[in-house]
Amino acid sequence: MSLERVGFYADCVEQIRLEGILEMPEGVQRPPACILCHPHPIGGGSMYVPLLETMAQVLVSHGWACLRFNFRGVGLSSGVPTGGLCEVEDVGGAYRFLLERQDIDGEDLAVAGWSFGAWIGLRWAVKGSQTRRIALVSPPMVGFDFFYFLDSSDAVLPGDTLIVSGARDQFNDLAKLQELSSRLGADLRVLEGADHFLFGHEREIAEIVASHWQ
């Protein structure tokens, strides 16, 4: 595995430069790639949270390239956090960055987000058919509206959606989660004994995502 610290700009008029880490598998020519979106910065979310680090390690071992990055205003990324108002543009910048690289298969780009990152990632994904696959980990059904953008006339649903949530998730509403899964035609996995923060379940979740995308 190779690791490269990278920088790119958010997909917006402002010059917001984002920091990221691109991890590449060894011996794979133009691998598919996954954009990893971190939880809310108010709760300490960044590209360095253990779950995203583990997901990157496992996905790379399965032949994927992985781009972790910090949303605007987090770490060395410029700008200020907007609570979700503009972070979708950050995912767009990550997508464009990967699309322009010659060593990555731009026809097979996926998104995986945890908590706040799941909300941002899905909002970006339904804006167009740019990604065929998305994984939503612990989508916070309480406090975040996952449905208003699905009802938009120009919404395009990803062809392959995986949802992973803990049975004891403090920010979950099971009825809403099941409705979201149904609307997206998703494969829903509920982990017994796991809460929203998924401590101790990092590798299990990473393997679920990697196996689903095999």
Language-model segments: residues:
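Acidic catalytic loop of the alpha/beta-hydrolase fold
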Residues: 143, 167-172, 196-197
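Gly/Ala-rich beta-loop-alpha elbow adjacent to hydrolase catalytic centers
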Residues: 113-121
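Active-site nucleophile loop of the alpha/beta-hydrolase fold
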Residues: 39-40, 136-144, 166
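Short beta-strand/loop motif that positions the catalytic acidic residue
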Residues: 156-158, 162-165, 169
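Serine-hydrolase catalytic machinery in alpha/beta-hydrolase-like enzymes
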Residues: 16-26, 30-104
